[in-house]
């Protein structure tokens, strides 16, 4: 691996300007935890009860004195906005009282790790009604149980997260809270949208930096290193998911994360990487050549096909649309394009779609929700009719069992953020397996194998559903703008 020293990195005028912007625009208002708590109560459909949520505790690796990297539990964060370990939150629905519990002061820990959050600091920082130390938690919950629990349930996410109380007849409800919170989390408020937008802005800068410097790189690891460096230097220390930097045939591996192979002799790189900002994810994929233009007709044709799939699906996003219908559209466009290239043949577009042959090349869902998780949660709706199920089964694969592509998913709503990430891949394993399946008659395997060296192409943006249509939150360059950045990087 070449040393990516300071002198090797190109800093564009856009990045230089951004440094000033980042320093002056990151003072955000409080996370709207109280608003979220009230929304959850509405979804629960009750006027009494106590919501109890535990944050992520400090945990060491097995057989080690070293702590695991901290990652806050997202349901807890949604009702608190607190990204600190060993905290708890309760919401008394009857009294509209949101209470945060922070760790008791520990002198030994403070000396070694720095002081923990005080109740005074927490009151100033977070949108809660009161803050107390952990020592008060058990007694506070016990008093609520003694006063209200005969008529009101104590809501928990899972049976394993029960608080310690002395009564054996506590009315725990571990079935209602999760779906209520999923329903509220599926639609983002303005604060959440700002966080996702900022995560996308930083991810866009990192993708741009990779494009500017790709001609200097000799290994996938250098791509990963520069992307992470750019995000961290913009104060986005955490990635929303493990970075994927697959070159050549590795681009056909959907979740390739080794990122350690040489780039020499390969055509394309599929870079699927997104920063996290204040616990909110971005999810961005770009596929680009290891040169100033597409290295082969095959690479250009597949990129243009995936580009068409994405553009046609994005422009149809609006509230009321069922995402599964966009999934079908993406497959239809893919089939038409692969038929033009001679890869699919021997039937009509509808016959090939119904056979499932297109899933050999497009094996995943068109997208998913984005929020506190990169594959975020959402409400569920009644399942489609059997007739609908028969129609859609040909484009539903195991990877589409969750998210907006499922038959059970509701129509898109204003405030949802979803990815649109079509892809076309040429996997040796998938093609070998397809030879044994009934739809093999629709595939020209000799023609398909000519495309194996390109690996695959995926393009992914994060799309906000608005009152009038959609807004693309992703700023990473793609298409001709992407190629121009690569060319300018070489010129510099």
Curated annotation (Swiss-Prot):
<dbReference type="InterPro" id="IPR052433">
    <property type="entry name" value="X-Pro_dipept-like"/>
</dbReference>
<dbReference type="GO" id="GO:0030145">
    <property type="term" value="F:manganese ion binding"/>
</dbReference>
<dbReference type="GO" id="GO:0006508">
    <property type="term" value="P:proteolysis"/>
</dbReference>
<dbReference type="GO" id="GO:0070006">
    <property type="term" value="F:metalloaminopeptidase activity"/>
</dbReference>
<keyword id="KW-0464">Manganese</keyword>
<feature type="binding site">
    <location>
        <position position="421"/>
    </location>
    <ligand>
        <name>Mn(2+) 1</name>
    </ligand>
</feature>
<dbReference type="InterPro" id="IPR036005">
    <property type="entry name" value="Creatinase/aminopeptidase-like"/>
</dbReference>
<feature type="binding site">
    <location>
        <position position="460"/>
    </location>
    <ligand>
        <name>Mn(2+) 1</name>
    </ligand>
</feature>
<dbReference type="InterPro" id="IPR007865">
    <property type="entry name" value="Aminopep_P_N"/>
</dbReference>
<feature type="binding site">
    <location>
        <position position="460"/>
    </location>
    <ligand>
        <name>Mn(2+) 2</name>
    </ligand>
</feature>
<comment type="similarity">
    <text>Belongs to the peptidase M24B family.</text>
</comment>
<dbReference type="Pfam" id="PF05195">
    <property type="entry name" value="AMP_N"/>
</dbReference>
<feature type="binding site">
    <location>
        <position position="272"/>
    </location>
    <ligand>
        <name>Mn(2+) 2</name>
    </ligand>
</feature>
<keyword id="KW-0031">Aminopeptidase</keyword>
<dbReference type="Pfam" id="PF00557">
    <property type="entry name" value="Peptidase_M24"/>
</dbReference>
<dbReference type="InterPro" id="IPR001131">
    <property type="entry name" value="Peptidase_M24B_aminopep-P_CS"/>
</dbReference>
<dbReference type="InterPro" id="IPR000994">
    <property type="entry name" value="Pept_M24"/>
</dbReference>
<feature type="binding site">
    <location>
        <position position="283"/>
    </location>
    <ligand>
        <name>Mn(2+) 2</name>
    </ligand>
</feature>
<keyword id="KW-0378">Hydrolase</keyword>
<dbReference type="InterPro" id="IPR029149">
    <property type="entry name" value="Creatin/AminoP/Spt16_N"/>
</dbReference>
<protein>
    <recommendedName>
        <fullName>Probable Xaa-Pro aminopeptidase ACLA_020440</fullName>
        <ecNumber>3.4.11.9</ecNumber>
    </recommendedName>
</protein>
<keyword id="KW-0479">Metal-binding</keyword>
<keyword id="KW-0645">Protease</keyword>
<comment type="function">
    <text>Catalyzes the removal of a penultimate prolyl residue from the N-termini of peptides.</text>
</comment>
<feature type="binding site">
    <location>
        <position position="283"/>
    </location>
    <ligand>
        <name>Mn(2+) 1</name>
    </ligand>
</feature>
<keyword id="KW-0482">Metalloprotease</keyword>
